[in-house]
């Protein structure tokens, strides 16, 4: 599923991401835009053989199991394919685990590059939340 910006913001809010660990909703919407272009089915292969999955591009080396990444830790206890459904709840649950891990949203390269230190409130502007 490809979400519209405000539709995604509403879903993320419903699942408790607004101000989760101090990160406002705009941070999450911005991250999703630059990680996956709001596409739940996005996948990207990394040079180390791992793959990133779903709307927040969650990595198979650490967080999910795709059955082909050697030495996966699967810290979210989830199959990577479950991160690619139209319902973003599994991705949100795992993202909460990731962002609680000590490095916050710095775990997402696209967030560091495009969202960190910017006015992320623009990402939820005009959304009826």
UniProtKB/Swiss-Prot annotation:
One of its GO terms (molecular function) is lysozyme activity. Its main location: secreted. Lysozymes have primarily a bacteriolytic function; those in tissues and body fluids are associated with the monocyte-macrophage system and enhance the activity of immunoagents. This is Lysozyme C. Gene3D superfamilies: 1.10.530.10. SMART domains: LYZ1. One of its GO terms (biological process) is defense response to Gram-negative bacterium. The gene is LYZ. The lineage of its organism: Eukaryota, Metazoa, Chordata, Craniata, Vertebrata.
